């Protein structure tokens, strides 16, 4: 009788350990999901602020007879423009203008990367299109 009780007790302990590990793994995955989603929403909000800062800076440059977009410069922005944007937004993200409409004087595409998040903005057919991606580094040599 003691042997049977001991076997049943061991099985119950094993089952409890397995269930505990499965529940713990579930909560780890759930925690990481919400952490990544929160970071993505934060990056998206910052990218919307980048868009507003680019528009504001372009209006200011228009008054000076210049353009915020400089295709011959790295990231499509002068160092002064990049510093101004980072000063306005108080962040350390990287902004790269990918397209610009000189007739309407608006930025029609840019990417904003902060941490492991990359936000892509494209203005097409009078609508704003946003993509938020989480970047995973697979190899570092």
Identify the residue ranges that each predicted region occupies.
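N-terminal polybasic/positive-inside topogenic patches
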Residues: 130-131
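N-terminal Lys/Arg-rich, disordered targeting/topogenic segments
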Residues: 1-9
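Amphipathic alpha-helical segments typified by the pilin-like N-terminal helix
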Residues: 9-51
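Extracellular/periplasmic head regions of type IV pilus-like filament subunits
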Residues: 64-127, 137-141
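N-terminal alpha-helical signal peptides/signal-anchor transmembrane segments
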Residues: 46-65
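Short amphipathic alpha-helical patches
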Residues: 16, 57, 62, 73-74
């Amino acid at each position: 009788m003691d042997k049977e009780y001991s076997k049943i007790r061991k099985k119950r302990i094993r089952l409890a350990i397995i269930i505990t590990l499965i529940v713990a793994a579930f909560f780890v995955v759930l925690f990481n999901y919400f952490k990544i989603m929160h970071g993505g929403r934060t990056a998206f909000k910052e990218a919307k602020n980048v868009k507003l800062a680019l528009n504001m800076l372009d209006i200011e440059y228009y008054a000076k007879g210049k353009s915020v977009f400089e295709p011959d410069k790295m990231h499509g922005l002068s160092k002064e423009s990049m510093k101004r944007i980072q000063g306005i937004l108080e962040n350390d993200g990287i902004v790269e203008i990918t397209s610009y409409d000189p007739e309407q004087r608006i930025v029609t595409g840019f990417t904003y990367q902060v941490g492991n998040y990359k936000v892509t903005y494209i203005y097409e057919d009078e609508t704003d299109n946003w993509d938020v991606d989480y970047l995973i580094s697979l190899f570092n040599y």
